[in-house]
Amino acid sequence: MLTRSILSVAVCGLLLSPLLPITRASQEEDTGKQDKQFTVELDPETFDTAIAGGNVFVKFFAPWCGHCKRIQPLWEQLAEIMNVDNPKVIIAKVDCTKHQGLCATHQVTGYPTLRLFKLGEEESVKFKGTRDLPAITDFINKELSAPAEADLGEVKREQVENLNIGKVVDLTEDTFAKHVSTGNHFVKFFAPWCSHCQRLAPTWEDLAKELIKEPTVTISKIDCTQFRSICQDFEVKGYPTLLWIEDGKKIEKYSGARDLSTLKTYVEKMVGVPLEKTAGEAGDEKVVIEEVAGEEDAAKKLTPQQLTGEDEFDQAIAEGVAFIKFYAPWCGHCQKLQPTWEQLATETHQAQSSVKIAKVDCTAPENKQVCIDQQVEGYPTLFLYKNGQRQNEYEGSRSLPELQAYLKKFLGHDEL
């Protein structure tokens, strides 16, 4: 068994793996409030297999432990959130009263002990944060998005570095799926005849040059006039469309300014690695063609407003009606809701409604306090605000018609 450093924490959080059996709740779940258990329960026979197959966040506990009992609902909630296909991390637990040898091997000396076992790493990571969902998810996001995971495959890292030769990767129908299947990719979907695409082209090339030393992301492009099926699969409806793709899945549609500095800042945010500025960039980064700026302003109105920080959040909810999605980029349910949320924003704007459709990334450090203040306990959480006052949490169906019907309750008869 690989030797791993121990991460003890009084917080609970684990991801459910579709590859591992879900067992009945142990004595820890003695309240009987939940019939279904989402956390994966491990034993000596399944533990090594689990950590050898992926990232695993383990809670080592004892059923009689009061702190363990208090954290149990939060642990189950995190497991339910992460219960998606191909999860980035498995949320699990080990009953140390049943498996004393296993807990002794991992140097468990107190309960609960929380340790993150990262795929390919010999040492586990100890969670030392507060026992709330934002702190735990922030920990997971930081640990699993960090490039330190490279030692599980220097070969994989070298392959990515070979692509980052200072040029945009030109993708085709034959190469697209394999290229984006693992890692981070910023992809431009374009048409050769599109004037905005033509203006963006040199900046896109410059962005690739800036990332020559950053192996965690590639800058790519695909011609939608030649490879329509790929563009249709990613719901591309206009040119250029810039999508952030992680491990083959669309995470976010970029809708910011298209100058080099702003694009670099966006990449830095997504990969969590500061990028160097180029000489003369400070003077050039604010030069934006008026036509493109106007187009981007219109595009922003058709997409959910990305709120950042307490001041921006307070301003958004101060007047009128604001429908806000609190989410985490790694959350599978959030990813499934994303296209519907974008469509809701588009149709709301087209109906000339005054309601604001927005979103808050709770894993971003600048939003941590916002999500704590708003008592966000799971992802996605949908709150509606009217003149600064929060209404009841929306817990209905996440289909577009149901979301629109909910909004109508708070709007005038002529809206939506």
UniProtKB/Swiss-Prot annotation:
Family from the record: Belongs to the protein disulfide isomerase family.
Protein name (database record): Thioredoxin domain-containing protein 5 homolog
GO cellular component, one term: endoplasmic reticulum
Residue ranges annotated for the Thioredoxin domain, each copy included: 26-145, 150-272, 293-412
Gene deletion effect: Reduced level of apoptotic cell phagocytosis. Loss of both Prtp and CaBP1 does not cause a further decrease in the reduced level of phagocytosis seen in either Prtp-lacking or CaBP1-lacking embryos.
PROSITE patterns: ER_TARGET, THIOREDOXIN_1, THIOREDOXIN_2
Subcellular location: Endoplasmic reticulum; Cell surface
General function of this protein: Possesses thioredoxin activity. Acts as a ligand for Drpr and is required for the phagocytosis of apoptotic cells. Binds to the extracellular region of Drpr and augments Drpr tyrosine phosphorylation.
Signal sequence interval, chain numbering: 1-25
Keywords: Disulfide bond, Endoplasmic reticulum, Phagocytosis, Redox-active center, Repeat, Signal
A GO MF term: protein disulfide isomerase activity
Principal location listed in the UniProt entry: endoplasmic reticulum
UniProt cross-references to InterPro entries, sorted A to Z: PDI, PDI_thioredoxin-like_dom, Thioredoxin-like_sf, Thioredoxin_CS, Thioredoxin_domain
Record's keyword annotation contains Endoplasmic reticulum: yes
Biological process according to GO: apoptotic cell clearance; positive regulation of apoptotic cell clearance; protein folding
Organism: Drosophila melanogaster (Fruit fly)
Motif (Prevents secretion from ER): 413-416
Pfam families found in the cross-reference section: Thioredoxin
Highest taxon listed in the record's lineage: Eukaryota
Gene behind this protein: prtp
Disulfide bonds: 65-68, 194-197, 331-334
